[in-house]
Amino acid sequence: MFVSRLAASGLLLLALLAVSLDGKPLQQWSQRWPHLEIPPLVVQNWKSPTQLQARESPAGGTTALREELSLGPEAALDTPPAGPDGGPRGSKAAAAAPQRLSKSKGASATSAASRDLRTDGKQARQNWGRLVSPDHHSAAGGGGGGGGGARRLKGLAKKRAGNGCFGLKLDRIGSMSGLGC
């Protein structure tokens, strides 16, 4: 049944095509397959990326922190150090130590830069310790600033604290608070 419908629709299409042409011969454009003239592919020559200098960032500028750390304490100074006769008094002490740096600009500037690079500070360690430690509770109460009823065990109680069910610590009266051990 399906094949007969397909054959009937094919014959109908051929009949309509013949009627639309009205017996005229095929035109030249319909004798061959119409296609657009596509030019052949052109190979593009790309320039290679330029090499960056050692102190140049990809954005084209210089990184101030990297430059300050690589050049040493002299880079932290706004003005070059005074020469032998460039001191305020022109004394021999200024001539004896021409490379002496002031505390406010030289040593502290480089230590401040290295302090900024440090990732794990004391405060971060304290916060992490509070999150990780299971003994300290966040609720208020208890004495000594340890947080909720945390108390320091001494002597034999300290040794027995780890002898609980599943390696958990026992509470003060020696039970596991409903774990069923």
From Swiss-Prot:
Principal localisation: secreted
Pfam families associated with the record: ANP
Native source species: Crotalus durissus collilineatus
UniProtKB keywords: Cleavage on pair of basic residues, Disulfide bond, Hypotensive agent, Metalloenzyme inhibitor, Metalloprotease inhibitor, Protease inhibitor, Pyrrolidone carboxylic acid, Secreted, Signal, Toxin, Vasoactive, Vasodilator
Bias-annotated ranges (Gly residues): 140-150
GO cellular component, one term: extracellular region
Residues making up the signal peptide according to the UniProt record: 1-23
Similarity comment: family membership: In the N-terminal section; belongs to the bradykinin-potentiating peptide family.
One of the protein's GO biological processes: regulation of blood pressure
Low complexity compositional bias, start-end: 104-114
InterPro entries registered for this protein in UniProt: Natr_peptide, Natr_peptide_CS
Disulphides: C165-C181
Chain spans, region Disordered: 74-153
Record protein name field: Bradykinin-potentiating and C-type natriuretic peptides
GO molecular function: hormone activity; peptidase inhibitor activity; toxin activity
Organ and tissue specificity: Venom gland.
Function summary: Bradykinin-potentiating peptide both inhibits the activity of the angiotensin-converting enzyme (ACE) and enhances the action of bradykinin by inhibiting the peptidases that inactivate it. It acts as an indirect hypotensive agent.
Cellular location(s): Secreted
